Amino acid sequence: MKIVIASDAKQPNATYRGALLAAGALPEEVVVVTPGDPDPGAFDGLLLAGGADVAPTLYGEAPGTPTLELHPERDALDFALFSAAEKLGAPVFGICRGLQALNVALGGTLWQDLPSQRARGVSHETDVNPHARKDHPAHVVRARPAPSLSRFAAAVVALEGTSVNSRHHQGVKDLAPGLVPLAASPDDLIEAFERPGGGFLAAVQWHPENLVAERKQKALFEAFLDACRARASASGRAGEPLVFDSLEGPLAVVKLARPAVLAAALASFHDHPGPPASAGGPDRPQ
């Protein structure tokens, strides 16, 4: 079994890896891929980690707030790996920025800046001190009735009324077609969703990797790993080697549910190469 974690180049990712290991993954089964890394080949699961903001141009908007911190290389990486996961039939789990990227890739939109565009009395960016504890509670999550009886949906329902951490200033505005909300914050911002049927695709807006010592939070990673193991077993571990279609490395072009998204990401990458986002970005890394 091979699980790929998509992450920023400068972002410490030991927390995400540690959460997967705590849930039962083996060290050799987890591979971290950052912008510019070689083609990871075929894989059995994809975890889209936190990071900088998703570019508004990818969901049809012009940048409208000075608080944006963009990382076009990461946008291109996430959408390419997500496309590969769709082609492979591999489970996908998004966390914070990962939730936002999945929503955009499937046709949804985002609030560019919650404090200025959607202030409703709940702070979603509580970790303003880089030395603050990453498990600091911000607000509770409210589970929503879901048609799915999936293991992931059950894990989210079990978190009803639980306090979670929060380190983001963007959020889901229009949920993409085919996605079902599983939980929301007290101000009704979507905090978790999944795509029922057609394989495992799920995401949360908070950072459960910092809360994995809590049994109910670890259950989210266990549900993801269970789906990854099923995929690996069905494919004889990792299936055929993945051949990217037109570009070298992880910036491969594979057909997206929303094809214009990757084209825009790649155009943004070539037009504005720039350095990776700093570690103090809007979705503060672990």
Q: Can you say where each PLM-predicted feature lies in the sequence?
A:
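Conserved G/P- and acidic residue-centered "switch" motifs that form tight phosphate/ATP-binding loops
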Residues: 96
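N-terminal beta1-alpha1 cap of cysteine-dependent amidohydrolase-like domains
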Residues: 1-93, 103-111, 115-163, 169, ...
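The feature captures the ABC ATPase H-loop/switch
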Residues: 99
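Active-site-proximal beta-strand elements of phosphoester/diester hydrolases
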Residues: 202-205
